[in-house]
Swiss-Prot record:
Its EC number is 2.5.1.55. This is 2-dehydro-3-deoxyphosphooctonate aldolase. Belongs to the KdsA family. It is an enzyme of class 2 (transferase). GO terms for biological process: keto-3-deoxy-D-manno-octulosonic acid biosynthetic process. It comes from the Bacteria. Coiled coil: none annotated. It is found in: Cytoplasm.
C-alpha cells in the first residue's frame, strides 16, 4: 500500500502541493486553562490568516534529559481536556505516544498520533499506532538519513494505514547540536507522503544545558523560511506565551506566541511563491 499524497485531518489538508498547513501549540500540556488559552489564541490567529491548524501538545515528554525534568501532566489529566478542545474549538488535536499500549488508549481522544524521533524505527510502535486508524505523524530520527524514512513509512502503510505524515526535525551534528539539511525535504517527498518541517525542534541543542536541552530560538524563522521556500505540506512550531518561564524543557526553542502572526504571514507568502499559487 502506498501512502496517501494528500492527508486530511479534520478540515486541514496536508499536501506537498497544496497551501501550507500548521501544527502548533505548547510543548507540554500544563493545565486545562493553559490549553484553552493557547488553543483559543491559535484558532483565532489561524482563522484570521486563513491557514489550517492542528493543535499540538504533549501529556508526557518521556525522553527528557534528566530524571528530575518536568514531563507533563499525564494521560489521566490531559486526555479529557483533549476531548474538550476538539469540541470547543473544532480543532484537530495531535499528541505523541511513547509505548505500544498508549496508542489504543490515546487514539479516541486525538486526531493525529505522533511518533517521537527517538522511536521512529521501533517497528512494534509504528504498527500499533497504524492499527488505530488515526493519521500518524512520524518525526524523522536525528540518526536517520532522509531516504531511510521510506522504510518507516512502509511499516505503517504495510499495517493497513496510508495516512502518514513525515516530519524533518534536524540531524545530529557533533555533540549537542542539530543541523537542518534542506535536501532532506524533497528526498522525503519522493516517498509519497506529505512532509512537515519542525522549525522549533530543529534549533534544539539536545542535552545542551547539562540537565536539560538548550536551543537557538533566533534561528526558527531562518530555517522555517528555508523549508517553506523548498516546498512542504506544513510547518510544526511549538509556541508559548512565555517560553522562558514555561514548565517545559523545550522553552529555549519554543517561539513566543506574540511572534507567531508575523512569522506565519511571511511563511504563507513564501509558500505561495514556492508553489506558484
Amino acid at each position: 500500500m502506498a501512502p496517501n499524497s494528500s492527508v486530511t485531518v479534520g478540515n486541514v489538508v496536508f499536501d506537498n502541493n497544496a497551501a501550507l498547513a500548521l501544527i502548533a501549540g505548547p510543548c507540554q500540556f500544563e493545565s486545562r486553562q493553559h490549553a484553552f488559552d493557547m488553543a483559543g489564541a491559535l484558532k483565532e490567529l489561524t482563522a484570521r490568516l486563513g491557514i489550517g491548524l492542528v493543535y499540538k501538545t504533549s501529556y508526557d515528554k518521556a525522553n527528557r534529559t534528566s530524571l528530575s525534568a518536568t514531563r507533563g501532566a499525564g494521560m489521566d489529566a490531559a486526555l479529557p481536556v483533549f476531548d474538550e478542545l476538539r469540541k470547543e474549538f473544532s480543532l484537530p488535536v495531535l499528541t505523541d505516544v511513547h509505548t505500544e499500549e498508549q496508542c489504543a488508549i490515546v487514539a479516541p481522544h486525538v486526531d493525529v498520533l505522533q511518533i517521537p524521533a527517538f522511536l521512529s524505527r521501533q517497528t512494534d510502535m509504528l504498527v500499533a499506532a497504524a492499527k488505530t486508524g488515526k493519521v500518524i505523524n512520524v518525526k524523522k530520527g536525528q540518526f536517520l538519513a532522509p531516504w531511510d524514512m521510506k522504510n518507516v513509512v512502509a511499516k505503517i502503510t504495510g499495517s493497513g494505514n496510508p495516512n502518514v505524515l513525515t516530519t524533518e526535525r534536524g540531524a545530529s551534528f557533533g555533540y549537542n547540536t542539530l543541523v537542518s539539511d534542506m535536501r532532506a525535504l524533497p528526498v522525503m517527498a519522493e516517498i509519497g507522503a506529505p512532509v512537515i518541517f519542525d522549525a522549533t525542534h530543529s534549533v534544539q541543542q539536545p542535552g545542551g544545558q547539562g540537565g536539560s536541552s538548550g536551543g537557538e530560538r533566533r534561528f526558527v524563522e531562518t530555517l522555517a523560511r528555508a523549508a517553506v521556500a523548498v516546498g512542504v505540506a506544513g510547518v510544526f512550531i511549538e509556541t508559548h506565551q512565555d517560553p522562558d518561564n514555561s514548565t517545559s524543557s523545550d522553552g529555549p526553542n519554543m517561539l513566543p506566541l506574540k511572534d507567531m502572526p508575523a512569522l506565519l504571514e511571511r511563511l504563507m507568502a513564501f509558500d505561495r511563491i514556492a508553489k506558484g499559487r
